[in-house]
Amino acid sequence: RAVVEDPPSSAAPPEPAKPLFASDEVIHLTIQGPVDVLARGGPDSRNVVPGTIGVNGSQDVLPIQLALRGITRRERDVCQFPPLRVVFTAPPPAGSLFAGQHKLKLVTHCRAAEAFQNYLRLEYATYKLYNQLTPMSFRARLVQVDYVTAAGSPIISRIGFFLEPIDDVARRNGMREAKVGERIPVAQLS
Protein backbone atom coordinates (compact mmCIF):
# COMPACT_ATOMS: atom_id res chain seq x y z
CA ARG A 1 0.00 0.00 0.00
CA ALA A 2 2.71 2.46 0.97
CA VAL A 3 6.45 2.54 1.36
CA VAL A 4 8.74 3.83 4.07
CA GLU A 5 10.87 6.90 3.57
CA ASP A 6 14.07 8.20 5.14
CA PRO A 7 13.82 8.56 8.89
CA PRO A 8 13.15 11.98 10.35
CA SER A 9 16.04 13.56 12.24
CA SER A 10 14.49 12.54 15.56
CA ALA A 11 13.89 8.93 14.50
CA ALA A 12 13.77 6.37 17.26
CA PRO A 13 16.16 3.43 17.02
CA PRO A 14 14.87 0.36 15.17
CA GLU A 15 12.55 -1.92 17.13
CA PRO A 16 12.33 -5.72 17.09
CA ALA A 17 9.38 -7.41 15.40
CA LYS A 18 6.23 -7.78 17.50
CA PRO A 19 5.52 -11.30 18.87
CA LEU A 20 3.25 -12.32 15.98
CA PHE A 21 6.04 -11.79 13.45
CA ALA A 22 9.00 -12.87 15.61
CA SER A 23 8.73 -16.55 14.61
CA ASP A 24 8.07 -18.64 11.50
CA GLU A 25 6.19 -21.38 13.36
CA VAL A 26 2.74 -22.03 11.88
CA ILE A 27 -0.06 -20.81 14.15
CA HIS A 28 -3.29 -22.81 14.41
CA LEU A 29 -6.23 -20.42 14.84
CA THR A 30 -9.97 -20.47 15.06
CA ILE A 31 -11.89 -17.51 13.68
CA GLN A 32 -15.53 -17.60 14.69
CA GLY A 33 -18.20 -15.30 13.31
CA PRO A 34 -20.42 -14.82 10.26
CA VAL A 35 -17.44 -15.26 7.94
CA ASP A 36 -19.51 -17.17 5.39
CA VAL A 37 -21.97 -14.26 5.14
CA LEU A 38 -19.13 -11.73 4.95
CA ALA A 39 -17.38 -13.66 2.15
CA ARG A 40 -20.53 -13.44 0.02
CA GLY A 41 -20.57 -9.64 0.41
CA GLY A 42 -19.09 -8.71 -2.95
CA PRO A 43 -16.58 -6.08 -4.09
CA ASP A 44 -18.51 -3.06 -2.80
CA SER A 45 -19.34 -4.51 0.60
CA ARG A 46 -18.33 -2.34 3.54
CA ASN A 47 -19.82 -4.76 6.06
CA VAL A 48 -18.01 -5.20 9.33
CA VAL A 49 -19.00 -8.20 11.42
CA PRO A 50 -18.15 -9.19 15.00
CA GLY A 51 -16.22 -12.33 15.72
CA THR A 52 -13.56 -13.93 17.85
CA ILE A 53 -10.07 -15.22 17.22
CA GLY A 54 -8.28 -17.78 19.32
CA VAL A 55 -4.98 -19.58 19.11
CA ASN A 56 -5.78 -23.29 19.26
CA GLY A 57 -4.56 -24.82 22.50
CA SER A 58 -4.85 -21.49 24.32
CA GLN A 59 -7.62 -20.25 26.58
CA ASP A 60 -7.32 -16.75 25.10
CA VAL A 61 -10.19 -15.91 22.76
CA LEU A 62 -10.09 -12.30 21.66
CA PRO A 63 -12.98 -10.20 20.32
CA ILE A 64 -12.45 -8.93 16.78
CA GLN A 65 -14.22 -7.29 13.90
CA LEU A 66 -13.87 -8.72 10.41
CA ALA A 67 -14.17 -6.97 7.06
CA LEU A 68 -13.33 -7.79 3.47
CA ARG A 69 -10.19 -6.18 2.09
CA GLY A 70 -8.28 -6.09 -1.13
CA ILE A 71 -9.27 -4.94 -4.58
CA THR A 72 -9.20 -7.64 -7.25
CA ARG A 73 -9.63 -10.53 -4.82
CA ARG A 74 -12.91 -9.03 -3.60
CA GLU A 75 -14.45 -9.77 -7.00
CA ARG A 76 -16.65 -12.92 -6.83
CA ASP A 77 -15.32 -14.24 -10.15
CA VAL A 78 -11.77 -14.03 -8.76
CA CYS A 79 -12.16 -15.20 -5.14
CA GLN A 80 -14.97 -16.97 -3.36
CA PHE A 81 -13.26 -16.26 -0.04
CA PRO A 82 -11.56 -12.83 -0.23
CA PRO A 83 -8.81 -11.54 2.08
CA LEU A 84 -9.92 -10.28 5.48
CA ARG A 85 -9.10 -7.36 7.72
CA VAL A 86 -8.94 -8.45 11.36
CA VAL A 87 -9.42 -5.61 13.85
CA PHE A 88 -8.99 -6.23 17.57
CA THR A 89 -11.79 -4.44 19.43
CA ALA A 90 -9.68 -4.27 22.60
CA PRO A 91 -5.89 -4.31 22.93
CA PRO A 92 -4.66 -7.93 23.13
CA PRO A 93 -3.05 -8.78 26.50
CA ALA A 94 0.69 -8.16 26.89
CA GLY A 95 1.56 -11.88 26.95
CA SER A 96 -0.58 -12.68 23.91
CA LEU A 97 0.77 -13.66 20.52
CA PHE A 98 -1.22 -10.68 19.23
CA ALA A 99 0.26 -8.19 21.74
CA GLY A 100 0.76 -4.79 20.14
CA GLN A 101 -1.53 -5.53 17.21
CA HIS A 102 -4.67 -3.58 16.33
CA LYS A 103 -5.43 -4.13 12.64
CA LEU A 104 -4.08 -7.03 10.59
CA LYS A 105 -4.37 -8.11 6.97
CA LEU A 106 -5.17 -11.81 6.60
CA VAL A 107 -4.41 -13.27 3.19
CA THR A 108 -6.88 -16.11 2.65
CA HIS A 109 -7.17 -19.15 0.40
CA CYS A 110 -9.41 -17.41 -2.19
CA ARG A 111 -11.02 -20.66 -3.39
CA ALA A 112 -11.50 -24.08 -1.81
CA ALA A 113 -9.53 -26.12 -4.40
CA GLU A 114 -6.13 -27.45 -3.29
CA ALA A 115 -4.42 -25.55 -6.12
CA PHE A 116 -5.33 -22.30 -4.37
CA GLN A 117 -3.60 -23.51 -1.20
CA ASN A 118 -0.48 -23.93 -3.33
CA TYR A 119 -0.85 -20.43 -4.80
CA LEU A 120 -1.11 -19.08 -1.27
CA ARG A 121 2.04 -20.99 -0.25
CA LEU A 122 3.88 -19.45 -3.21
CA GLU A 123 2.73 -15.96 -2.26
CA TYR A 124 3.84 -16.54 1.34
CA ALA A 125 7.21 -17.87 0.12
CA THR A 126 7.65 -14.70 -1.93
CA TYR A 127 7.31 -12.57 1.20
CA LYS A 128 9.77 -14.81 3.08
CA LEU A 129 12.26 -14.65 0.19
CA TYR A 130 12.03 -10.87 0.11
CA ASN A 131 12.68 -10.85 3.88
CA GLN A 132 16.02 -12.55 3.11
CA LEU A 133 16.91 -9.78 0.67
CA THR A 134 16.05 -6.79 2.84
CA PRO A 135 14.71 -6.01 6.31
CA MET A 136 12.63 -3.28 4.65
CA SER A 137 9.97 -5.78 3.71
CA PHE A 138 6.69 -6.99 5.16
CA ARG A 139 6.97 -9.91 7.52
CA ALA A 140 4.40 -12.65 7.08
CA ARG A 141 3.19 -15.34 9.49
CA LEU A 142 1.65 -18.54 8.18
CA VAL A 143 -1.56 -19.66 9.89
CA GLN A 144 -3.83 -22.67 9.70
CA VAL A 145 -7.31 -21.25 10.24
CA ASP A 146 -10.44 -23.11 11.25
CA TYR A 147 -13.30 -20.86 10.13
CA VAL A 148 -16.45 -21.39 12.20
CA THR A 149 -19.90 -19.77 11.90
CA ALA A 150 -21.24 -17.59 14.69
CA ALA A 151 -23.37 -20.59 15.74
CA GLY A 152 -20.26 -22.80 16.02
CA SER A 153 -20.60 -24.86 12.81
CA PRO A 154 -17.36 -25.50 10.90
CA ILE A 155 -17.08 -23.71 7.55
CA ILE A 156 -13.65 -24.69 6.26
CA SER A 157 -10.07 -25.12 7.47
CA ARG A 158 -7.39 -23.56 5.28
CA ILE A 159 -3.97 -21.96 5.45
CA GLY A 160 -3.52 -18.22 5.21
CA PHE A 161 -1.05 -15.66 6.44
CA PHE A 162 -0.97 -12.40 8.33
CA LEU A 163 0.97 -9.44 6.94
CA GLU A 164 2.89 -7.08 9.19
CA PRO A 165 1.31 -3.60 9.31
CA ILE A 166 3.20 -0.91 7.35
CA ASP A 167 3.79 1.23 10.46
CA ASP A 168 5.44 -1.76 12.16
CA VAL A 169 7.70 -2.30 9.12
CA ALA A 170 8.71 1.35 9.35
CA ARG A 171 9.27 1.31 13.12
CA ARG A 172 11.25 -1.93 12.93
CA ASN A 173 13.59 -0.18 10.48
CA GLY A 174 13.86 3.11 12.38
CA MET A 175 11.78 4.88 9.74
CA ARG A 176 8.26 6.18 9.25
CA GLU A 177 5.48 5.47 6.80
CA ALA A 178 5.56 7.54 3.63
CA LYS A 179 2.38 9.44 2.87
CA VAL A 180 1.37 8.60 -0.67
CA GLY A 181 -1.67 9.44 -2.75
CA GLU A 182 -4.54 7.19 -3.67
CA ARG A 183 -4.31 4.38 -6.20
CA ILE A 184 -3.89 5.39 -9.81
CA PRO A 185 -6.85 4.19 -11.89
CA VAL A 186 -5.91 1.64 -14.56
CA ALA A 187 -7.34 3.93 -17.25
CA GLN A 188 -4.62 6.50 -16.46
CA LEU A 189 -1.81 4.00 -17.05
CA SER A 190 -0.81 4.13 -20.69
Where are these regions (language model features)?
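Phosphate/dinucleotide-binding and metal-coordinating scaffold of catalytic cores
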Residues: 2-190
